[in-house]
């Protein structure tokens, strides 16, 4: 049991290291549209710049009252299951619109297959980023080992 816990901690630490490219703080679409050179600062100190055309397309997709709620970049969580997850009401609404899927007001999470992820990334390469998730480690059921 101890070795398993130590391994989990090591894997989580490595995943966090891999995620250094993610922003320290995501900005809203509203904030980014006001910037001359829209960007966020990443955890590793580099800057991630957004394509203004992508931001304007996102602004066209979402009602204006949600511009202050859509946090960018949209994070595509990749985990153990093979599916990708998008979280956040405004983020999910955008993704559903782009993919032609039905969106429900209460929906704040959507799972995507890799074909959908590819389509989303192709349409919004600077407004989306991959994030490697530790959820599968912390959420997996513990298996008791015998002998």
Curated annotation (Swiss-Prot):
Please name the InterPro entries in this protein's record. Answer: UPF0216
The record's listing under Pfam families reads: DUF61
Q: Highest taxon of the source? A: Archaea
Family stated for the protein in its record: Belongs to the UPF0216 family.
Name the NCBIfam families for this protein.
Answer: PRK04115.1 (NF003153)
Tell me the protein's name.
Answer: UPF0216 protein MK1676
Q: Which organism is it from?
A: Methanopyrus kandleri (strain AV19 / DSM 6324 / JCM 9639 / NBRC 100938)
């Amino acid at each position: 049991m101890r070795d398993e816990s130590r391994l989990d901690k090591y894997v989580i630490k490595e995943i966090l290291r891999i995620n250094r490219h993610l922003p320290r703080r995501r900005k809203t679409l509203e904030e980014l549209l006001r910037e001359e050179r829209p960007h966020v600062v990443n955890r590793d100190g580099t800057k991630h710049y957004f394509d203004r055309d992508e931001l304007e397309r996102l602004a066209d997709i979402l009602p204006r009252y949600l511009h202050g709620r859509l946090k960018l970049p949209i994070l595509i969580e990749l985990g153990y299951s093979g599916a990708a997850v998008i979280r956040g009401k405004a983020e999910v609404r955008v993704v559903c619109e782009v993919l032609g899927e039905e969106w429900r007001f209460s929906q704040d999470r959507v799972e995507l297959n890799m074909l959908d992820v590819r389509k989303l990334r192709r349409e919004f390469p600077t407004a989306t980023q991959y994030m490697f998730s530790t959820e599968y480690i912390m959420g997996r059921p513990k298996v008791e080992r015998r002998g």
